[in-house]
């Protein structure tokens, strides 16, 4: 399986994402810069955290118009796994690949610590490696992770089981304690916590690795079935 890590000006978690795939998952991975226009040959797309374009205007608002984004949207429409973490989640929201928006954290402070999450839906291509209702600990690092949507959208997210991860503690004021959601099809996931920073027991936590092993397992199963 071949992964693309999209690199925007100001991305600072691209190397972590690359390491998680190459060394944690043992799969092929390449950096793809924002100036590129094609993702041909890649099986999954990863949008890492950071401060793309300095987070000017809004987080992800400028990156959304990068030359690579039409290819990201095309990959999502083709059913390929697309994962946006932290700033990557914000870019997916700005691009309309996921519903809702991000606001400043409710206390107006940057939060950088390991938090407790609950796996709300383990039937997605990103979460099948977890148990339903499992509690996990994953690092966060953001100033604008306060997820917002209208009540109708929130009800729809719940009804369609699009909420994959939920905070199990106060973190940023996110509506419904949402930490990660998918699109209706289930192949695009945006999450504020950083699973790529929790893939090695050597560093004290490997509970994020299952996000990536889930993607790989789903891809292998679908390709074996297809063949």
Curated annotation (Swiss-Prot):
Q: Which GO terms describe its biological process?
A: 'de novo' IMP biosynthetic process
The pathway is: Purine metabolism; IMP biosynthesis via de novo pathway; 5-amino-1-(5-phospho-D-ribosyl)imidazole from N(2)-formyl-N(1)-(5-phospho-D-ribosyl)glycinamide: step 1/2
Q: Cellular component per GO? A: cytoplasm
Can you give the residue ranges of the Glutamine amidotransferase type-1 domain? 3-227
Any one Gene Ontology MF annotation carried by this entry is:
ATP binding
Active site (UniProt)? 86, 194, 196
Q: Does the keyword Hydrolase apply?
A: yes
Quote the catalytic activity from the record: N(2)-formyl-N(1)-(5-phospho-beta-D-ribosyl)glycinamide + L-glutamine + ATP + H2O = 2-formamido-N(1)-(5-O-phospho-beta-D-ribosyl)acetamidine + L-glutamate + ADP + phosphate + H(+); L-glutamine + H2O = L-glutamate + NH4(+)
Q: Where are the transmembrane segments?
A: none
The entry's keywords = ATP-binding, Cytoplasm, Glutamine amidotransferase, Hydrolase, Ligase, Nucleotide-binding, Purine biosynthesis
The EC number of this protein is 6.3.5.3, 3.5.1.2
Membrane as UniProt keyword? no
Where in or outside the cell it occurs: the entry states: Cytoplasm
Q: What is its main location?
A: cytoplasm
PANTHER family, per database record: PHOSPHORIBOSYLFORMYLGLYCINAMIDINE SYNTHASE SUBUNIT PURQ (PTHR47552:SF1)
Say what the protein does: Part of the phosphoribosylformylglycinamidine synthase complex involved in the purines biosynthetic pathway. Catalyzes the ATP-dependent conversion of formylglycinamide ribonucleotide (FGAR) and glutamine to yield formylglycinamidine ribonucleotide (FGAM) and glutamate. The FGAM synthase complex is composed of three subunits. PurQ produces an ammonia molecule by converting glutamine to glutamate. PurL transfers the ammonia molecule to FGAR to form FGAM in an ATP-dependent manner.
Instruction: Give the multimer and partner information.
Output: Part of the FGAM synthase complex composed of 1 PurL, 1 PurQ and 2 PurS subunits.
Name of the protein in question? Phosphoribosylformylglycinamidine synthase subunit PurQ
The uppermost taxa in this organism's lineage are:
Bacteria, Bacillati, Bacillota, Bacilli, Bacillales
Q: Which gene encodes it?
A: purQ
């Amino acid at each position: 399986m071949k992964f693309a890590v999209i690199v925007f000006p100001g991305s600072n978690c691209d190397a972590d994402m690359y390491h998680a795939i190459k060394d944690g998952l043992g799969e092929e991975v390449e950096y793809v810069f924002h100036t590129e226009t094609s993702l041909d040959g890649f099986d999954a797309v990863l949008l890492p955290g950071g401060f793309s374009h300095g987070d000017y205007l809004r987080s992800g608002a400028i990156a959304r118009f990068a030359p690579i984004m039409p290819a990201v949207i095309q990959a999502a429409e083709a059913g390929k796994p697309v994962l946006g973490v932290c700033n990557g989640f914000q870019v997916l929201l700005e691009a309309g690949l996921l519903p809702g928006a991000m606001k400043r954290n409710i206390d107006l402070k940057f939060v950088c610590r390991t938090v407790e999450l609950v796996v709300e839906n383990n039937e997605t291509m990103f979460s099948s490696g977890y148990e339903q209702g499992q509690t996990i600990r994953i690092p966060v690092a953001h100033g604008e992770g306060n997820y917002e949507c209208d009540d109708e959208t929130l009800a729809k997210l719940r009804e369609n089981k699009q909420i994959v991860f939920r905070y199990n503690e106060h973190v940023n004021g996110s509506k419904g304690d949402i930490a990660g959601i998918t699109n209706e099809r289930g192949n695009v996931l945006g999450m504020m916590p950083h699973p790529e920073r929790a893939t090695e027991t050597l560093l004290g936590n490997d509970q994020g690795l299952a996000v990536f092993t889930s993607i790989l397992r789903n891809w292998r199963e679908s390709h074996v079935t297809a063949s």
